[in-house]
Amino acid sequence: MEEIKRLVLAMQFMTRLPIPIEIDVEKREFYRIASYFPIVGIVIGGILSLLYIALKDFFSREIVMTFIVAFSYVLTGAMHIDGLADTFDGLFSNKDKSKMLEIMRDSRLGTNGVLAAIFIVVLKILFLTNIHENITLTALLITPIIGRLSIVFSMMISKSARGGEGLGGLMLGKVGIREFAIAFVISIATSYFILPLAVFVKILTISLFVTYIVSKYISLRIGGMTGDTLGAVNELAELTALICFVSVSL
C-alpha cells in the first residue's frame, strides 16, 4: 500500500493530471517517490503517443510535433522547462554562487532563460519531425522515461545546493542506489516491450552521460543541484534521447 501511495504522489508531483486523492507522507520519506518517476514518464509518453495517433492523419508532421511538444508541457505544468530557463538565467548571470541561486529563485525570466526555453522547444520539434515515422511512437514513449530516470540519476550523484531547502532539497542528498535501481529496472522492463534492449541501453547510456556532465558542471558552479537544475536535466536528457533517435533513423 505504501508503494501505491508513493506512485500516486509521484504522479501528482510530476504532472498536472487530475488525481483527486490526498496522500499523507512524512517529509523525511518524500524522496522515495523518485523510484516511480519512470512510471510518470510512461504515462506521459503514452498520452503523447495517443495524441500523435489522433493527429497524424490530419496535419503535417511539423504541426503535429508542435502540438506534441506543447502538450507535453501542459501535462507537466511546464515545470521542467521553467527550471531550465531559471537555470540558464542563473548560470549565465556571471554572478557569484549565492547570487546565482537567488536569480534562479526569482519568478521573473531573464533573456538567457527565455532564449534557452525557445531553443529547447524548437530543437525538440525539429528532432521529433526528423525521426523516421516507423519509430516515432517508440521515441514518444521512451523519451519521457529517459528524462525522468535522468532526474533520479542526477539526484543520486548530487547534493542540494540550498542545504535541503525547497522541493528539490527534499530529495537531493537522500535519493540513493536503491531508488535509482528501482527506477532503472522499471525503465528497462518497459523498454523491453517497445524497442530492442541494446538500442535502449545505448540511448540511455548517452543520456545518462550527458546528465552526469551537466550535473557535475552545475554542482561545480553553485555547489550542488536544485529543483530548477533537475528540471534542466530532464529537458537536456530528453533532447539527447531525441537526437539519438534521429541518428537511429538515418
Swiss-Prot record:
Membrane topology note: Multi-pass membrane protein
Transmembrane regions listed in the UniProt entry: 33-53, 63-83, 109-129, 137-157, 180-200, 203-223
Pfam families named among the record's database cross-references: CobS (PF02654)
Reactions it catalyzes: alpha-ribazole + adenosylcob(III)inamide-GDP = adenosylcob(III)alamin + GMP + H(+); alpha-ribazole 5'-phosphate + adenosylcob(III)inamide-GDP = adenosylcob(III)alamin 5'-phosphate + GMP + H(+)
Molecular function as annotated in GO: adenosylcobinamide-GDP ribazoletransferase activity; cobalamin 5'-phosphate synthase activity
Biochemical pathway: Cofactor biosynthesis; adenosylcobalamin biosynthesis; adenosylcobalamin from cob(II)yrinate a,c-diamide: step 7/7
GO cellular component: plasma membrane
Function: Joins adenosylcobinamide-GDP and alpha-ribazole to generate adenosylcobalamin (Ado-cobalamin). Also synthesizes adenosylcobalamin 5'-phosphate from adenosylcobinamide-GDP and alpha-ribazole 5'-phosphate.
NCBIfam families assigned to the protein according to its UniProt record, in alphabetical order: cobS
Protein name: Adenosylcobinamide-GDP ribazoletransferase
Gene this chain is encoded by: cobS
